[in-house]
Amino acid sequence: MGLVAAVGILHVAFMVAEVGFWTTLVPKLKIYGEAQAAATAEVGKNMGAYNGIFGLLLLWLAWKAPELGARPARAFATSLLAGVVVAGVVGGLTIRWTIPVFQSVPALIALATLWSASESPKR
């Protein structure tokens, strides 16, 4: 669950950046100019809210996984990480091509690690 927590931390950081620093960060990253950044600030806050939800749920899951048990924790992690992958792909198609690199790729690595480390089914 370590990589699940890492993806959670990334998404909390995305939330802070999108909610608190959209109008200054977006022009510096050359995503939009200053006028467009100001005009899309509310959209940035909305994106930040969703990233925060993903981040906090992933962090909660990493913390509570031992209590949930391996199979339920893995199922919940898979659902959340798949949502992160989809959100990253959509962001890459609609906003900027780098979004999947920073959002989907870490989630895919966490998914691959999660599933490769899981027990093989008993026959």
Language model regions located:
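Membrane-water interface at the C-terminal end of transmembrane alpha helices
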Residues: I109-R123
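Core segments of alpha-helical transmembrane spans in multipass integral membrane proteins
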Residues: I9-E18, L29-W63, S79-A82
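Juxtamembrane helix-break-helix junctions at the cytosolic face
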Residues: L56-R74, E119
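Membrane-helix boundary connector in multi-pass membrane proteins
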Residues: E67, V86-P100
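Alpha-helical transmembrane segments of multipass membrane proteins
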Residues: L59, W63, G88-V89, L108-A112
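Interfacial segments of alpha-helical transmembrane regions
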Residues: M1-I9, P72-L81
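Non-cytosolic membrane-interface motifs at loop->transmembrane helix junctions
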Residues: T98-L108
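Helix-loop junctions at the membrane-solvent interface of multi-pass transporters
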Residues: G20, W63-K64, L93-W97, S116-A117
